UniProtKB/Swiss-Prot annotation:
It comes from Mycobacterium leprae (strain TN). This is Probable replication restart protein PriA. GO terms for molecular function: 3'-5' DNA helicase activity; ATP binding; DNA binding; hydrolase activity; zinc ion binding. PANTHER family: PRIMOSOMAL PROTEIN N. InterPro entries: P-loop_NTPase, PriA, PriA_3primeBD, PriA_3primeBD_sf, PriA_helicase. Coiled coil: none annotated. GO terms for cellular component: primosome complex. Initiates the restart of stalled replication forks, which reloads the replicative helicase on sites other than the origin of replication. Recognizes and binds to abandoned replication forks and remodels them to uncover a helicase loading site. Promotes assembly of the primosome at these replication forks. Zn(2+) 2 binds at C380, C383, C399, C402. Keywords: ATP-binding, DNA replication, DNA-binding, Metal-binding, Nucleotide-binding, Primosome, Zinc. Disulfide bonds: none annotated. The gene is priA. Its cofactor is Zn(2+). Binds 2 zinc ions per subunit.
Length: 651
């Protein structure tokens, strides 16, 4: 596979008689190209060629085991066309690195007969939702039903996924489920192995070692797996006779691939469902604008519960104005940065013997500081990154970007040496709550030290978004702090992501009938807060989609972000031959916090140009950019550019 874009095409080679039996479509081979050996795949065998020059010989067949199936190859081609990528880049995502010993050992073992078909599926869990029972019936009949599922608060989503997979397997088909991270994968594994024979289930994730991952992947390839579950790259798994593709929590940015061509697992899964003509399911506690667009277009059905059921299952949500807690008469409220009504709710839950969840947006102690006099943000003198406090005992500040310490902080604007906290992190919050609730255990769960589960006993659990532990029986209360840090970001998905973070935490709280309450420290008039209070993410997604359509933002349009030096971006535009309706936005400086494109000159200013086209011209946009990149790739002096189609964060 050649890494240069202009050589992303098929090449013809001669196959010797000794290699003929092994050199079948899909096998790995080594070929000589311009004097060096490169890896490749056999795509097809033909008796003729359209090449007019002299053909070279295949150097060797690396393995006689075909690893690139026809279905995966079609999916790879579709992803390349959708995201303006190259086949080598997508194939690296789709086909894992070979492990010779594992391959020899695996191929020496005969393929075992498939385990018994799962028993009948109890439909009661799905019948709570409108069209839920119909979706299971469609799976039993091997119909290509497509649905966007709105999970109820407190719902055991993994059980519903397991039931859907078991139904597809009972119909003689296979199923594929994609989740954001290892925690979700572990939860799903426990659920599916209670309904489907463990011998026919394979879990794939990036955390596996090369040998284990390749061994499991070969099991899928050989048809020994009826159900494959995994993280984002598992969406390319070579599942035989695929009948159902499922994606959980597509709002999670872990489903977006950080490597070129940056595909999103939701989009790849839907492409695969379309190509395979199989059923598809997108589920979550909230709903993205992209998932809702599938419903509004009629491509997918809406699977939601009646409002009466939602109200009965959801906790009571109370919005509290955060402007006045500093003046509260309760000293504990001032200490914990909480209105006294929120503290009373926490105390009531603790007194009832239930844990209390406290969600804070940032980890660390004080991750952001500002001048105490003029409120100018404190920034590093070396890289302009934000300065933070590590803990109470450590003197001075530390840069969050470069890690340099600054022992003598002085405001660059007014010269003051007084600082104030802009954002308070999880550890500082835990410290403050420990003082406000003397004698109460305080558990901290953050990105680097996640606690998977807490006991059903009184405790304060401070967690960052995505690190909330599960609690048997649910939390008695949840407090959502510093909500402005999520809502106030200048980002296309700020409101959508804030609601997802809040609902993911609130879904862990008991129903209102059992005393569950969620206190969100935010203005009740904010539309996103209102959606949380009503527990109505579908209407929020509808409003979000309408707003984006009005101003021309994805998913109502397709946008390509082109990053590189000004000269490189201009060269690409000249060669790309963009669609006539393409709208150019920018260029502007590369957004703060976005990494530079690989291979760009150090110190050179990097700009970002946005190219916007109507939704029906997305494939044309990708094709034109891919063609332009190929033309530039031929030139020895060209500078690299990075192209991302519909990136999560535009700028």
């Amino acid at each position: 596979m050649l890494s240069v874009p202009h050589l992303d095409r098929e090449f013809d080679y001669l196959v010797s008689a000794e290699q003929s039996d092994d050199a079948q479509p899909g096998v790995r081979v080594r070929v000589r190209f311009h004097g060096r050996l490169v890896d490749g795949f056999v795509l097809e065998r033909r008796n003729d060629t359209e090449h007019f020059g002299k053909l070279g010989w295949l150097d060797r067949v690396v393995s006689a085991q075909p690893v690139l199936t026809a279905e995966v190859r079609r999916l790879v081609d579709a992803v390349v066309a959708r995201y303006a990528g190259t086949r080598p880049d997508v194939l690296r995502l789709a086909v894992p690195t070979r492990h010779a010993r594992v391959e020899r050992e695996t191929l020496a073992i005969p393929v075992s007969p498939l385990p018994l078909i799962p028993g009948p599926v109890d439909p009661s869990g799905w019948e709570v939702y409108g069209r839920g029972g119909q979706f299971l019936t469609a799976l039993a009949e091997s119909r290509a039903a497509r649905a966007v599922w709105q999970a109820l608060p407190g719902e055991q989503w993994a059980d519903r996924f397991a039931e859907a997979a078991a139904q597809a397997i009972r119909a003689g088909r296979a199923a594929l489920a994609i989740v954001p991270d290892q925690r979700d994968l572990d939860v799903l594994w426990r659920a599916v192995t209670t309904r489907v024979d463990e011998r026919s289930v394979v879990a794939l994730s990036a955390g596996l070692g090369q040998a284990v991952r390749y061994q499991r992947w070969l099991k899928v390839l050989r048809g020994s797996a009826r159900l494959v579950i995994g993280t984002r790259s598992a969406v390319f798994a070579p599942v035989n006779d695929l009948g159902l593709v499922m994606v959980w929590s597509d709002a999670d940015d872990m489903l977006a691939e950080p490597r070129a061509p940056y595909p999103h697992a939701r989009e790849v899964a839907m492409l695969r469902a379309y190509q395979a003509r199989c059923a598809a399911l997108i589920g979550g506690y909230t709903r993205t604008a992209e998932a809702h667009a599938l419903v509004r277009s009629g491509w997918a059905h809406d699977v939601v519960a009646a409002r009466s059921v939602v109200r009965a299952r959801a906790p009571r949500v109370v919005a509290l104005d955060d402007s006045g807690y500093a003046e509260e008469s309760d000293p504990a409220a001032r200490t914990a940065r909480l209105p006294s009504i929120a503290l009373r709710a926490a105390r009531s839950a603790l007194a009832a013997g239930a844990p209390v969840l406290v969600q804070v947006p940032r980890r660390g102690y004080v991750p952001s500081l500002a001048c105490g006099r003029c409120r100018t943000l404190a920034r590093c003198r070396h890289c302009t990154g934000p300065l933070s406090l590590l803990d109470r005992a450590t003197p001075g500040t530390v840069c969050c970007w470069c890690g340099r310490a600054d022992l003598t902080l002085r405001c660059a604007r007014c010269g003051s040496e007084v600082v104030r906290a802009v954002v308070v992190g999880a550890r500082r919050t835990a410290e403050e709550l420990g003082r406000a609730f003397a004698g109460m255990p305080v558990i901290t769960s953050v990105g680097d030290t996640i606690v998977p589960e807490v006991g059903a006993r009184p405790a304060l659990v401070v967690a960052t978004p995505g690190a909330e532990p599960r609690a048997p029986g649910g939390y008695g209360a949840a407090l959502l702090l510093d909500t402005w840090a999520l809502l106030g970001r200048q980002d296309l998905r700020a409101a959508e992501e804030a609601l997802w973070r809040w609902m993911t935490a609130a879904a862990l709280v008991r129903a209102r009938g059992d005393g569950g309450v969620v206190m969100v420290v935010a203005e009740a008039s904010i539309p996103t807060v209102q959606s949380l209070m009503r527990w109505d993410p579908a209407s929020h997604a509808e409003a979000e989609l309408a707003a984006r359509t009005e101003v021309g933002l994805p998913p109502s349009v397709h946008i390509a972000a082109v990053d590189g030096t000004t000269g490189a971006v201009n060269e690409l535009l000249q060669e790309a031959r963009l669609p006539d309706e393409a709208d150019l936005l920018g260029p502007v400086d590369l957004p703060q916090g976005v990494r530079r494109p690989a291979g760009t000159p150090l110190g050179a200013p990097i700009s970002r140009l946005l190219v916007r086209v109507p939704r029906e011209q997305g494939w044309q946009l990708a094709a034109s950019l891919r063609r332009g990149i190929g033309v530039l790739s031929v030139r020895q002096t060209h500078q690299l550019v990075r192209v991302q189609i519909d990136p999560l964060h535009i700028g």
